[in-house]
Regions:
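Active-site neighborhoods and metal-handling regions in enzymes and metal-associated proteins
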Residues: 1-411
Length: 411
């Protein structure tokens, strides 16, 4: 991956968004072919974007029917949206006649209207194997009536399989999302001092995100300090941070639909941590890099997961150490923690993981750390570069390429 600017320029190759859309669509077609599907009905907004490049209006909770995408075997995608004129005007890669009204699938009548429009476009494919990514109780009753000759299968599994390995342009988007997140982190750190509220720090990070073009934040985002770090509380409050507090920061920016996501824990103020605090941070830190070290071809996601919540290596996790894939959805397969046997898969180059262990004890402190890492052929590609709090790292891990290079405090 290259660490270049965000703009399109004529003097070097950067992200080719047309190529990215074409390659994503081909991966979806390949996943459909592997599953033997004739038609794919997609209602998750992030996956509508994956198939069509349509950026939808977003809210704090999912709104079923905001947009949809239909992918017929051997055909071009259909985009279903409330923003018909916008899409037809600004998305020339989707034929105008393939932009349809939004899918009103919250009622039986709305579902029938949507189905009739789809059948008029795809013909006999509506009588084959149809993958659907969201299957509410209502849809489970209405769709079989609308497509009486069809066989329904899990469309979410199909689209997740398509997204599992990132293209080169997707990897570049992910890196830029991480770079924006790092910038937000730095702005936050520049203002981390006794007397500031958790929510004030988060607002500073969000402002930097927005200034650099972030579309959204990876979640409500977390600045968690003092007693809220152990037991761990995963949201931001109005607490005033005090000198010596451990401060967990878990934030992520969004670049063109791809989500940055990583976590660090810092000591507030010009003060050294205790030996107990250093030991807990080291537990989380070692677990993080030992798990990241497994992200190579030839391993499985279970090899990553075995380090998380391990009774010997990560005994103070409270069961909170975890990890997940990421892309156009900040939480998507492959998973790495609490795996059932059927969820264990071989790692392939280009898979992406967010790995986030925790270690903490009430009265001492809590320590959540997180990196994003791509699976590599020979070694993991850990592209989260923000260093850890030097005061909390006793022994620098060989895979940590930043911490220790600017150590300012004694062990």
């Amino acid at each position: 991956m290259s660490e270049f600017g965000f703009m399109g320029v004529d003097w070097e190759e950067r992200i080719d968004f047309g190529r990215m859309r074409r390659e994503r669509l081909q991966r979806a077609r390949d996943a459909m072919a592997k599953a033997g599907a004739d038609l794919l009905l997609i209602f998750s907004l992030e996956d509508v974007r994956y198939l069509t490049g349509f950026r939808s209006h977003l809210g704090p909770v999912a709104l079923l029917g905001m947009a949809g995408a239909v992918l017929p075997r051997g055909g071009e995608p259909l985009l279903c949206t409330h923003d018909i004129v916008h899409a037809r005007t600004r998305m020339p890669w989707i034929k105008p006649e393939n932009v349809m009204d939004r899918p009103f699938i919250r009622t039986e009548g709305g579902t029938k209207k949507f189905a009739d429009e789809v059948k008029a476009k795809v013909g006999k494919l509506a009588e084959g194997k149809i993958g659907v990514d969201i299957w509410t109780f209502g849809l489970s009753q209405w769709l079989p009536k609308c497509f009486p000759k069809a066989q329904f299968v899990d469309g979410r599994e199909i689209i997740n399989n398509a997204k599992m390995i990132k293209t080169q342009d997707e990897m570049e988007c992910q890196l830029i999302a991480n770079m924006i997140t790092e910038a937000g982190f730095q702005a936050l750190l520049d203002n981390l001092k006794p007397g500031v509220k958790e929510c004030e720090l988060l607002s500073i990070a969000w402002q930097k995100f927005t200034e650099l073009g972030s579309e959204w934040s990876q979640c409500s985002n977390i600045v968690c300090s003092g007693p809220y770090a152990a037991p761990y509380r995963r949201f931001t409050s109005d607490r005033v941070i005090r000198e010596g507090d451990m401060v967990i920061v878990d934030i992520g920016a969004c670049f063109n639909g791809y989500w940055g996501d990583f976590t660090r824990t810092y000591v507030c103020g010009n003060i050294l941590p205790t030996k107990e605090q250093i030991a807990l941070h080291q537990e989380s830190y070692n677990t993080l890099f030992n798990a990241c070290g497994e992200a190579v071809v030839g391993k499985t996601n279970a090899d990553i997961g075995k380090h998380l919540n391990d009774p010997k290596g990560n005994p103070n996790s409270d069961g909170l150490s975890g990890g997940h894939g990421a892309g156009v959805n900040p939480w998507e397969p492959p998973w790495v923690a609490n795996l059932s046997p059927d969820a264990i898969i071989p790692l392939q180059e280009g898979m992406l993981f967010s790995i986030e262990p925790y270690a903490g004890k009430p009265g001492i402190g809590g320590f959540r750390l997180e990196n994003q890492v791509f699976v590599g052929k020979e070694e993991p590609n850990i592209f989260t570069k923000l260093s850890f709090d030097e005061r909390l790292v006793k022994d620098v891990h060989p895979l940590d390429k930043s911490t220790g290079r600017k150590r300012a405090y004694p062990k």
